Amino acid sequence: MPQPIPKKRKTYTNNPRNAAISMVSSQHPLNVRPSGNLYLESGPASGATREELMGDFALFPEELLLEVLGFVDDAQALKNLSHASRVLYAYLYDEELWKKHYTQKAQAQEKEGVEPPKIKWRGSWRLSILGLDAQYEAKPQIPGNMLCSDVLFRPFQCSQVDYTSIFWRVIKEEELYHRDSLATQEPLDEVLPSGRIPRLPESSLTQEVFDKSWSNKPFIMTNSDSSRWPHWDLAALLERFADVKFRQEAVQWPLSLYSQYLAKNRDESPLYLFDCNSKAMQTLKSEYVVPEVFQKDAFKVFEKCRPDHAWLIIGSQRSGSTFHKDPNCTSAWNAALVGRKLWIMLPPDVVPPGVSTDDDESEVTSPVGIAEWVLSGFYNDCVNNTSAQIGITFPGECMYVPCGWWHMVINLDDSVALTQNFVPSIRLGNALNFMKNKKKQVSGFRPAEVKNALEEILAACQDDEDAETIRNWVRKFDELNLKENLQNEDCGELLESELPAMPILELFKLLLTKNGKTEELAKGLEDLAKLEKSELAKVTGKSEMWTKLTEAPSFSFGFALNE
């Protein structure tokens, strides 16, 4: 009997994925021009010069001028100054200046427990703070090349960026992968060219397969069932939670106000709704099911003292997050409910272009926003890095972000998403390593909640070194008599002078034991030891075996040089 011919799997072309960043910029509303235009002056200028129109302010470097203006907390004074000349008007037209003016006040009032003043959104921070309708906004034109300034022009250029045009190659390719993965319900992994993020059907991804093959690599989980994830578009959320306040980075606004901001703003980096503690989120958490392979979460043992880990995310087109690693060496999943998201990912040991860190990554500096990063060519540098993984999640798809991986996310559309951080049991060693060797970078834990958990575990555990460490910290906590705001502050925001590093590692080990996770803990500690040996070899350039050999009393190379 003839054997059936195996079905040939589709293959895909390795097309270039460079961004099309050679774009024509829109004209600035006040005719501010890029600095390079200074070299294109065609003839002698007529009328007052920039210096004359700025007076003594002309002595200030531009960055310093805007910094000084940022300290003025009287909106009317800023408005009056802007009327002194059309050049000063241009500097005081800067959206970031007015955004800081509002958010700094709002943050200070929030800390004091004072309700920030209500604001009616009018399409920009400047218009909203001054209470002006857009139809009455003056736009005096700067003549010729009188004001050529990248400080003013570049943020405007970034606020006009069209990512669907810039990333058209990637979008076209990812749309094909998305369609094919749903049509075939088969994994798209080995058949993809390098640098692409694989797609795996949720129905075929078992815990064993995840633990063995995928826990340390990014992938996109697909599901053809349209009811797999909640249908939470902005309109549906507004019907239910219009007056509920959500966290949007530096502010807490009702969803109705944020929706107006989302519909129209001029920000270079639009505000991102990233909320975990609103009344709405407490309700929404019960309306979705975590994918089965992500349910084995070692951090569950922290219970009441666990850092925030589940968020609703809403962002306008162009919003997103710059390169970062998720906290406490956790992994994450991110389900796109509305809108497309572009993901740029790099392994833990590959620092992204345009980002700098110190040796232990306690200080991460990314000097530019997302649009600036893309337009400056750093994205194209990433594409040319063979380690980079780039992909797009479409509504209904779920991205898996392995612990320690660098990732940047860009919203190509107005977007709604769900995300959770977790520690896969198979990656427990990574979390233990982080807690032991990067104590100062542990974040999200709140002292008062941790103290309660420590006291509870002390009452049930046997005396050992970990218990003694915990007991000493609890004693120190009581002696400090911390103010209530510090007791409930994220430990990552506290100085060591305010509170010694919390014994999170010791607590974690005892909680795992208490919850019957002794086998997982033993395996995690074994992996921790391997990670430490590997890190030591990187630092010293010597393996453990080499160190043992060279430390032996009778060690020699055994060369017979006299023969």
Enumerate the predicted regions with their spans:
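N-terminal accessory scaffold of Fe(II)-dependent oxygenases
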Residues: 2-398, 408-563
